[in-house]
């Protein structure tokens, strides 16, 4: 599979996932010791360091999540959603190991799957790519007020399945709350005014309290969702596979929802820049002014 993450640039360093994982059989990992992400000098391309988590050896599918950077508790921190279903927190400085490799070793890691997603009640491993099975992280972890928000999901070809949205203390790695009434997602969450918005692949949008995980409302778009929500200017924007651009009111109350059909599936996420809304469908790019 392709490397489908976005590069993260911090100073003179570029952090990017490698997409390392399983082969065509989806059961064999050809390069279990290869890194899931690397850091390069943005000016020269020289390798600065690589992921030291060892996640590749336990890859469920591939390393697709983009990295996140922020200062948490006065410490520069990298956050990555793992191909093994764990979320990792790292220092921004690599350490040289005994073999001479410069590794970014995790300060903490959190399993973002429920235990029964991995092992059933009879003690047997739950098969991957089945509705009750464990998932990797594909969407980018989001940092908001020192907390990390991330959700699990799989390749859309695998269909629907169990999910989980986690809120993690970015400094300690402690799980502050979790929400399991959400299905698999490949979307990145949006957080605005202490509200979290998450869209699941099945087409349902959820709004929760960012501090407690309390659910305020859900909205079913009745179509698959590949992209991520955008919370801006009092609205929550999102496209779906039916080609609908959904416009929901931002807030705790059940939202008024408007839709504009763009004539082709929307697999991307809407973007606002310089007062213009950009939405890409499978056939067109729309630029919508104020």
How does the language model describe each region?
Residues 1-290:
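Noncatalytic, solvent-exposed loop/strand surfaces
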């Amino acid at each position: 599979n392709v490397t489908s993450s976005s590069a993260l640039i911090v100073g003179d360093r570029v952090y990017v996932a490698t997409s390392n994982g399983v082969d065509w059989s989806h059961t064999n990992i050809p390069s279990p010791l290869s890194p899931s992400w690397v850091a390069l000098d943005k000016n020269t391309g020289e390798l600065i360091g690589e992921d030291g988590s060892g996640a590749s050896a336990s890859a469920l599918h591939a390393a697709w999540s983009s990295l996140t950077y922020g200062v948490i508790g006065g410490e520069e921190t990298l956050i990555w959603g793992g191909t093994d279903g764990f979320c990792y927190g790292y220092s921004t400085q690599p350490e040289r190991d005994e073999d001479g490799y410069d590794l970014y070793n995790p300060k903490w890691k959190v399993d973002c799957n429920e235990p029964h997603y991995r092992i059933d009640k009879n003690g047997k491993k739950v098969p991957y790519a089945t509705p009750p099975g464990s998932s990797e992280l594909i969407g980018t972890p989001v940092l908001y007020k020192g907390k990390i928000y991330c959700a699990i999901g799989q390749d859309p070809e695998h269909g629907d399945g169990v999910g989980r949205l986690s809120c993690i203390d970015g400094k300690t790695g402690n799980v502050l709350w979790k929400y399991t009434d959400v299905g698999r997602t490949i979307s990145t969450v949006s957080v605005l005014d202490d509200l979290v918005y998450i869209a699941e692949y099945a087409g349902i949008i959820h709004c929760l309290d960012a501090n407690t995980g309390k659910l305020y409302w859900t909205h079913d778009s009745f179509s698959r969702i590949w992209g991520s929500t955008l919370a801006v200017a009092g609205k929550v924007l999102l496209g779906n596979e039916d080609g609908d651009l959904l416009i929901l009111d931002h807030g705790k109350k059940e939202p008024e929802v408007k839709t504009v059909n763009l004539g082709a599936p929307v697999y991307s996420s809407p973007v606002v820049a310089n007062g213009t809304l950009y939405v890409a469908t499978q056939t067109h790019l729309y630029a919508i002014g104020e």
